[in-house]
């Protein structure tokens, strides 16, 4: 009896890739919850949130229980960050993206992003305190090595198979920054626990995130869900469908006369 969730960000209208993710979640859960991941105030808009509800209703996908809106739970994420800080598991990082990219021979993580070299992890505590007091812009990063010592060896469950965890492959992941009070990694993992999600379904592009999320679950004492990742829908050039690249929206398909059944078939 699995509880799944569909968790889009209201940063644009849904496209066929979202339809696949939603149908996959509903198909594999006896209960499927809806969560709006709207922690990026610069990109998320109420009109897009309303559009998500409209598209799901058109596809006859009715979520179980109330919709969880992440921007309404910022205090919960702050409490998690404070708890991690008290245990010495997060630290302020003052490096810019340009600093990280410019690091000599900077390797890349599973998500393709340059790995953080750890410069601020070992910063002199007095200098760190001075920069914080001055109000210097910074992010909060998870000290992955310290968290792994606390958690010990970990595995996660993917389609019934145990997979060894390698969260160190991500480097010290950002858990919060000034323009985002908490990161996707922290919010999604926290909310899956709070909402009682037992099966996390999502696209192949997020498979590697399970390693980091399992570490967060272990250090926070959150339940461990099962994971199941689905293939991505690709465009004619072999790239995954995305809002940024102007993928055709479900609203546009509806206005062009496609039926829900036709969209469902295309999304499979």
Region locations from a protein language model:
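N-terminal Rossmann-like or analogous alpha/beta NTP/dinucleotide-binding catalytic cores
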Residues: 1-110, 204-205, 209-222
């Amino acid at each position: 009896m699995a509880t799944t969730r569909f968790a889009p960000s209201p940063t644009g209208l849904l496209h066929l890739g979202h339809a696949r993710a939603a149908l996959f979640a509903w198909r594999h859960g006896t209960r499927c919850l809806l969560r709006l991941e709207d922690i990026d105030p610069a990109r998320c808009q109420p009109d897009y949130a309303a559009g998500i509800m409209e598209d799901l209703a058109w596809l006859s996908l009715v979520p179980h229980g109330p919709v969880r809106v992440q921007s309404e739970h910022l205090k919960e994420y702050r409490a998690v960050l404070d708890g991690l800080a008290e245990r010495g598991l997060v630290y302020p990082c003052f490096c810019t993206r340009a600093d990280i990219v410019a690091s000599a021979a900077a390797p890349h993580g599973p998500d393709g992003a340059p790995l953080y070299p750890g410069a601020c992890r070992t910063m002199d505590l007095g200098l760190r305190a001075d920069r914080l007091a001055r109000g210097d812009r910074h992010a909060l990063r998870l000290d992955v090595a310290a968290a792994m010592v606390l958690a010990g060896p970990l595995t996660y469950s993917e389609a019934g198979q145990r997979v060894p965890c390698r969260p160190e492959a991500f480097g010290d992941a950002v858990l919060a920054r000034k323009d985002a009070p908490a990161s996707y990694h922290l919010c999604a993992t926290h909310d899956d626990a709070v909402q009682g999600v037992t099966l996390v379904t999502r696209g192949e592009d997020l498979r590697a995130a399970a390693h980091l999320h399992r570490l967060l679950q272990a250090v926070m004492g959150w339940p461990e869900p099962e994971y199941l990742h689905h293939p991505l829908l690709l465009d004619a050039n072999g790239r995954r469908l995305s809002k940024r690249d102007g993928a055709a929206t479900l609203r546009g398909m509806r206005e062009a006369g496609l039926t829900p059944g036709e969209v469902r078939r295309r999304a499979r």
